[in-house]
């Protein structure tokens, strides 16, 4: 049996309308161990799809990410390459946003893409996700919503 996803107290506070609903309630849990059939684990990758660590490794081990596939839908996960520079990351996020728009039946759980080994901060990545964040089926980390 899979472990349950874990939300921090802060995430739960905002998800339940904390502080008059200043932040959206579409917040991902800090620790994702399982997904519903319509949920997709969105993770940062490299263009070569070498899923060695972090969320990429979780996607590979748990949610069907394919070794050697650095972008797009794979199993119950979606890879966004974040290691090839800011411009390429923005383009990949644009492609993800189009895909999310085309699939309103899916719930996209976007991890803190780019904020691990790629070296970006939430302040750098969150604005790139502004269009995706407007979609009702896209859920983001609280660190991105707070930017």
Labelled PLM ranges:
Residues 2-147:
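Macrodomain-like recognition of ADP-ribose-binding/processing modules
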């Amino acid at each position: 049996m899979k472990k349950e996803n874990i939300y921090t107290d802060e995430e739960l506070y905002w998800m339940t309308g904390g502080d008059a609903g200043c932040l959206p309630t579409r917040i991902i849990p800090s620790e994702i161990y399982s997904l519903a059939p319509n949920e997709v684990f969105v993770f940062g990758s490299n263009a070569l799809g070498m899923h060695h660590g972090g969320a990429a490794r979780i996607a590979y081990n748990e949610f069907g990410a394919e070794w050697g596939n650095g972008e797009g839908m794979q199993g119950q996960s979606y890879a966004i390459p974040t290691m090839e520079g800011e411009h390429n990351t923005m383009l990949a996020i644009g492609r993800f946003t189009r895909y999310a728009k085309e699939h309103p039946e899916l719930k996209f759980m976007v991890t803190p893409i780019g904020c691990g080994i790629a070296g970006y901060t939430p302040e750098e990545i969150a604005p790139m996700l502004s269009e995706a964040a407007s979609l009702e089926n896209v859920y983001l980390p609280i660190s991105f919503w707070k930017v």
